[in-house]
Amino acid sequence: MTKYRLSDESRSFSYQDNGNKKSVLLRQIIALTDFNDVQAGTPGGWIDNESVLSQSGDCWIYDENALAFSGATITGNARITQASVVRDGAQISDDVWIDRAEISHNAQIRDNVTIQDSVVRGECLLFGDALVMCDSEIIAARGLTRESDQLLQIYDRAFVSHSRVVHQAQIYGDAKINYAFIEHRAEVFDFAQVEGNEENNVWICDCAKVYGYARVIAGSEEDAIPTLRYSSQVAEHAVVEGNCVLKHHVLVGGHAQLRGGPLQLDRPHPD
């Protein structure tokens, strides 16, 4: 089935990529037949090549301000809405919804993932029912650690909002991340909650982990920024809140509560 054609008219689009100015020639998609909620004759977004948008399935670029180009692929029943940009080898498939977001540089988005008002860039994998929204930035970078092949992943029912998740971090299970900076090989999973606010983010880096039903919460006061570094862990039903810094080999578990601060726990030479 051929469900769309490209417009006769074209437009040039200029953009910055790693500090370099580039341009691409785009043509608009126009539906040839009725499918899903799209009617024949409806114009959609702009692409540089028919290989970008599959002629099979119900996938569609809905907004006339949305663009997809430079080796990107959109397949299955994926929906691209509002002024989104999908480019540079990004792969969007299955029942993914991309809404006013930018996806680029070989990012893979699958299953039922929703990305709204956010940026996803680099070699990463988002799948399951994950939700990324509210000006979040997912910036993958491999080769910075000994696990050079590890991909940044967000999956299962993970929820990320107002946050930066970078490098090779892992967010999964039913984890909820709000106003946080998660980097390196840090992991947040199970039913863990990481809760920053407009004043202070939570910072989790290196190989730190938050899991179980643990909560790490930022305060609104100056420096009320919980920081987990190195191999520190917050697990089970523990709560860490405020100006608390956890470093080497520290495990806060059970129903322990660390609040207020300034407080620093470090165990550089474990028994």
Language-model region placement:
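Extended, highly charged clamp/arch subdomains and adjacent linkers
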Residues: 84
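Short, flexible active-site-proximal loops enriched in glycine and acidic residues
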Residues: 73
